Amino acid sequence: GDHRDLHSFPTRRSSDLNNVLANCIQMLDRIGQQFKDGEEVVVCPLPLYHIYAFTVCMMALFSKGSQIVLIPNPRDIDGFIQTLKPHSITAFAGINTLFVGLGRHPEFAKLDFSKLHLTMSGGTALTQAAVSIWKGVTGNTITEGYGLSETAPVVSFNIPGKEEIGTVGHELEDTEVALLDSYDKPVGDGESGQIAVRGPQVMLGYWQRDDETAKVMTEDNFFKTGDIGVRTDSGAIKIVDRLKDMIIVSGFNVYPNEIEEILTSHPDVMEAAVVGKPDEKTGERVCAFITVSNDIKVEDVTAFCKEQLTNYKVPKSIEILEELPKSTVGKILRRELRDKG
């Protein structure tokens, strides 16, 4: 059988490491022509134990002779900007919260972005607000992709210069993506379903957890991601939300990403997270947590939501926080908010 090595990425996933190498080759096939050997300066604000940073920055782009600028503490926005000042950056690998945090900082706009030709996003949903803020400051479009630790990580990525905003692009070379229903059968055209992946970048399984591996692999060896997606008319993949984060209100499916997108489009809302909490009447209710840039009233934000959302999707409670809970890479932790109070 396969020899399984243990690497130190989150949740102890096993791989023969060929999947990481395969993903490097796949990513270079998608974006490599954008990079001149030995001439690129790539900003990597994510820790190298995170598979996104490891495969894309440390392995794929480093193999092109790129200089990788590491940011030890991306939460320190002032320090982050100071680190960037001596560099004429050509590429940036980030996530949604970083694009917003940097883009709203007045000192960031003073940096030289004349050579910045590729901004990559992954790890968490990218909001339209983040795209607008980033492009307004840097002049650069954010190119979004999608992946997981189990897929080393990249499954799909937009073609630079041909981005379909709001999607994570088409699957990489030698990668198959299926959208499945609850019975692991393909959904119809235009319907949403669980994203399942088959390709050389997919893991062998969870380390010493054959029972958990069996839960996520189909009979024909597709890995079930736990994410809900849909195809656009062009065949690009659009992420709807995490299956486990979906909220069911009176039998209706509510996706937090959709509501967070509306909330962050409010000019005074910086970040938003939406979760479902138990409700005696409706099963679950929609609860929102936001950070703001100005002194605004919750009632005003609720009214803003009512203008753009069907009633059952409007948050029944909105709480303003100083800061949203985040992981070490800046990903908003909905589960902590779900357990809050």
Regions found by a protein language model. Give the residues of each.
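AMP-binding/adenylate-forming catalytic core of the ANL superfamily
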Residues: 92, 198-199, 204-205, 212-215, ...
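Active-site glycine-centered loops adjacent to acidic/histidine catalytic or metal-binding residues
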Residues: 123, 147, 169, 184, ...
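Beta-strand->loop->alpha-helix junctions that form or flank phosphate-binding loops
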Residues: 143-150, 169-171, 275-277, 319
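Conserved ATP/PPi-binding loop(s) of AMP-dependent carboxylate-activating enzymes
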Residues: 170-174, 183-216, 254
